[in-house]
């Protein structure tokens, strides 16, 4: 049930940076915005491309190699391997795609444009909220079932039918019938 929710409902707007920005500035932005990745617009000879830079890229390609993050451009560590999905993809499908492509982020594309991003972390964070909402829904449905099975609603339904039959017999005015129905609901 939870897994059938489309990613469109939980996606975030991606953060986009220019490829000539330093890794240091991108890392700082990622920490400030609490995101594990950014889209990078790279100006390559003869074409422009959109790539992704992740927190793991910064660690593996800059910090582990002891390169100065303020001197390395983000386009030098970004990857063109964007995994994209349509907005109606379900959470279950998104998780399967993440596992298949061994990625922690998916980019949502609509009409050829990137409109959102969803990360494994987003899916983990959203799970408790979804579970809480589902618990509320289940409790509400159980309450309705209890009312129906206790006869309370069916008794009221019968009373409304009796009131309506009284209307057919012209015993009560329309106003009297409305008043009786309102009193019944209260």
UniProtKB/Swiss-Prot annotation:
Annotated keywords: CBS domain, Repeat
SUPFAM superfamilies: CBS-domain pair (SSF54631)
The keyword Nucleotide-binding is annotated on this UniProt entry: no
Key word Repeat present: yes
Pfam families: CBS
Classification via InterPro entries: CBS_dom (IPR000644), CBS_dom_sf (IPR046342), Diverse_CBS-Domain (IPR051257)
Domain CBS: from-to ranges: 10-69, 77-133
Source species, domain of life: Archaea
Protein name (record): Uncharacterized protein MJ0450
Species the sequence originates in: Methanocaldococcus jannaschii (strain ATCC 43067 / DSM 2661 / JAL-1 / JCM 10045 / NBRC 100440) (Methanococcus jannaschii)
């Amino acid at each position: 049930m939870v897994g059938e929710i489309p990613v469109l409902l939980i996606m975030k707007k991606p953060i986009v940076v220019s490829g000539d920005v330093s890794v240091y500035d991108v890392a700082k932005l990622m920490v400030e915005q609490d995101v594990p990745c950014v889209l990078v617009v790279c100006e390559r000879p003869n074409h422009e491309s959109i790539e992704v830079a992740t927190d793991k890229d910064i660690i593996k390609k800059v910090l582990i190699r002891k390169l100065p993050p303020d001197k390395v451009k983000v386009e030098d560590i970004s990857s063109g391997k964007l995994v994209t999905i349509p907005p109606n993809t379900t959470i279950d499908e998104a998780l399967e795609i993440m596992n298949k492509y061994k990625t922690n982020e998916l980019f949502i594309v609509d009409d050829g444009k990137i409109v959102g991003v969803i990360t494994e972390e987003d899916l983990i964070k959203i799970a408790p909220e979804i579970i809480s909402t589902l618990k509320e829904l289940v409790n509400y449905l159980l309450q309705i079932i209890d009312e129906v099975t206790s006869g309370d609603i069916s008794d009221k339904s019968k009373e409304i039918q009796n009131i309506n039959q009284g209307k057919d017999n012209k015993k009560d005015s329309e106003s009297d019938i409305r008043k009786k129905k309102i009193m019944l609901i209260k």
